[in-house]
Amino acid sequence: MPDVGIRFRAFADEPTIRELKSQLRLACEIYNTLRWADIYFYQRDGKGLSKTELRQLALDLRKQDDEYKRIYSQAVQQIADRFYDAKKRFLKGLARYPREKKPHKWYSLVYPQSGWKVLETREIRTKSKKNKKKIMTLQLANLGVFKVIVHRDFPLDKVKRVIVKLTPSERVYISFVVDQEYPQLPKTNKTVGIDVGIEKLLITSDGEYVPNLRPYEKALNKTRKLHKALSRKKFLSHNWFKAKIKLARAYEHLKNLRRDIYMKLGKYFAEHYDVVVMEDIQVKQLVGKSYKKMRMRLHDVAFYELRSIMEYQLRKYGKELRLVDPAFTSMTCAKCGYVKKDLTLADRIFVCPKCGWTVDRDYNASLNILKRSGWEPPLAPVELRPLPLVKSQWQGGALKQEASPFRVG
C-alpha cells in the first residue's frame, strides 16, 4: 500500500512552542555535524558513512551532549535518515551534495511509530453536517501536548510516522503518514491532452479551459508593502520578527490557495479521464529566457507544482500521467502537421497557411500533445476559443473566477 500524508493544523501553549523551536535548532546542529563527519570520513577513507553508521553517530552525539538529550532518541535517528536520503539522491545524480542547513530553515521533527500518543479525541460542534471536525489531544515524547484539529478520518493503527512542523508563519502542523489505499475510481476509457499556459492556466483537448487566477500578481502591491515594512525594522528586533511573520503568512496564504486549486484540478481529471497527457516542460530554461514580468507570471503559475500534484492525484486514484516532448506543439497544425515557425506569442489564433485550419493556438497545442501520446484527437468542429469549465462540474468545491481575499497578519 502507498504511504499517504494527512496534514492537520495544531495548537500548543507558549512553553511547548518555545521547546519546539529549541529542538528544531538542535536538530539542525546534529544534521550539520553528520554532514561534516561524512565529508571527513570520505576524505580520509575514500568512503562515506552508511545509514547504520550515521544513525549510531547521531545517538552518540545525543549521549555526549545533555542539550541533544532533549530530542527524542528515535527523532534523532530520523535526522540521520534524512541526511542519508539526501546523500543517496546525490549519488544517483538527482541532486547536489546536501548543503549545510541554516537553523531558521529547519522546520520539522519526525517521530516514527513510537514516541507519540493520542490522549483524547472529541467532536466539535459545527454548523455543517458534512464537515465534522474533531479535536485530538496528541502527546509527543520530550516535547509536549498539541491540540490537533482533525477534519478527516484516518486509521490510527496504520500510522507509520508523525511529523510536527513549525512554518515560517509560526503556525504548527501535524502530519500523519498512513499506510492506506485510496478507493480506485471507475475507468472512463478517456484520454485528454493538456496545454498549460499563462493567460489560461490549462486548456484541454476536449475544448475546455481553466482561467489563471494570478493570485501572486494580484497581491503584489500588498506583498511589496510588507517587504518595505520588514526592511524598515531593526534586524532581529522584536518588531522585525513580527513583520517577518506577517510577510510569511501572506506568502503562505498564496501558496495554500494555489495548492488547493491544483489538488481540485487533479481530482477532477482523475474522475473524468484514465490518462492525462502533459508537456515535459523544462521550467528553468523557460524562466531564464523570459523577461521580468513573464518570469513573475511563470513563478506564479508554478508549472512543476501543477504537474507534481496532477501526477500525485492521478496515481492515488489508479490513473496515469504521460509526458511528451513540448517542442513546436503550438506551431504545428494538428490537422495536417505543417509547422508554422513564424508564429509569435502575440498570435493567439493559429491559422494554418497550408490547409486553412483556424483555431485557438492553445487548443491546437493540446491536440498536438494528445497526438504525441499515441492517441488520435477528434478533430470535430469547435469554436475559435475553448469553452471554460463549468462550475457545476467540480467535485469538492467550485473554482472561483477570482482569488480569495488577501489577508495580512
Swiss-Prot record:
InterPro entries, alphabetized: Cas12f1-like_TNB, RNA-guided_DNA_endo/Transpos, Transposase
Keywords associated with the record: DNA recombination, DNA-binding, Metal-binding, Transposition, Zinc
Domain of life from the UniProt record: Viruses
Gene Ontology terms for molecular function: DNA binding; metal ion binding
DNA-binding recorded as keyword: yes
Record GO biological process: DNA recombination; transposition
Sites where the protein binds Zn(2+): 333, 336, 352, 355
Family to which this protein belongs: In the N-terminal section; belongs to the transposase 2 family.
Protein name: TnpB-like protein ORF409
UniProt source species: Acidianus two-tailed virus (ATV)
